[in-house]
Amino acid sequence: MIIPSYIKERKQPMKQIFNPYLPSYEYIPDGEPHIFNNRLYIYGSHDRFNGTTYCENDYVCWSAPVDDLSDWRFEGEIYNRKQHPHKEECLILFAPDVIQGSDGRYYLYYSVAHSSRMSVAVCDSPAGHFEYLGDVKTKDGRVYGIQSGDYVQFDPGVFMDDDGSVYLYSGFCPKKTEDEHGRIMEGAFVCRLMPDMLTMYELPHIIIPRNWTCPDNAGFFEASSMRKINGIYYFIYSARINGLHYATSRYPDRDFVYGGRIHSSSDIGLRGYTIDNAAYPNGNTHGSIIAVNNHYYIFDHRFSNNTSFCRQGVAERINIEKNGHISQVEATSCGLNNGPLSAEGTYPSYIACHIRNLTITSDMPKEDRLKLMPYITQDGEDRDYGDDQYIKNMQNGCMVGYKYFNFNNNIDINNNANILTTDYVNNSINSNNSN
């Protein structure tokens, strides 16, 4: 086993942490990490276990001290869908983002499903109870995004530059170029906001078009997020179901050049894994980068429960080279642990980072593939307690993998490893000790 150099060290003793980094009953995808007052806050949408669509729960928040990313605290509900004042076709809160304004208050940007309206809520603290403020609008007071000819408003990413300028990014680029209301879906776009955090200085303009120069299957799809690192602007985005990618520029609003893939929770792009032959069940993706104690991390999500609607947050440490390049990081079980997990101890099965059935082929109907695939799930209904997920549907041809563990103390896995199973496992499980 080859352990990447960036996860070999452990700077200080602390409780171990796994992927997913939140309790297994918590389904928070689309995570935007931000540091306020020496705490790392995660703002994301909120899936419901056994839900029938994306983001069925209200916004909640978790945070951890920057000096111990294993010590996550539940901050509670920060915004309820019933606070949204408009009647919508589907009152579902899609992926949000948060920024601290120049006035010291915290602004939450969000879009209700299919509304194409970017709304804003405000709070005096980073994880208090946000109150609806208004909708993003043009100088003449018109709410932008709801008329034919507007760009579709979706997945806000909000960013404050060093000079205090605030930029709002959005965009959606499926196969069709406009929705049923004539609103345009042609790529990622940006506008600059006035100090009221609602009014645009100018109409949005495209920064990454549909026909952008990039490798196959790496074009912009959704999930806009902006970061500035060492003078370089990094636009992080999702390229459909093959991971989080990035583009760079010397400007926040133009001239972006494709950089590469940062992370795929299915390891697509590494070791020969592809969309049709992934290391873990794949689907959409959304997240961003944060610097904590001189290390950089990518926050993303993975899938569970054999569905697209039970997503969980995962994170990995990344390396940004002197020239600004980010190499793709693999999906692991240890994530924020900043090093391999101890080979001594008991670990829950749900921290698996590879789940496959080697008998599945790409030409199989989706329904047949789902029947054969093992998956991570839980018993009971959606809840806020009970860290008891497990792997279900293990059968002949299935493989589950975990990375990484520290065997430096001459631990012999043949003599010391036990696999504790549930009633859901039939027949026997063989473990393979390989390097």
Task: Please report, for each region that a protein language model flagged, where it lies by residue.
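Carbohydrate-active catalytic/glycan-binding domains of CAZyme proteins
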Residues: 2-425, 430
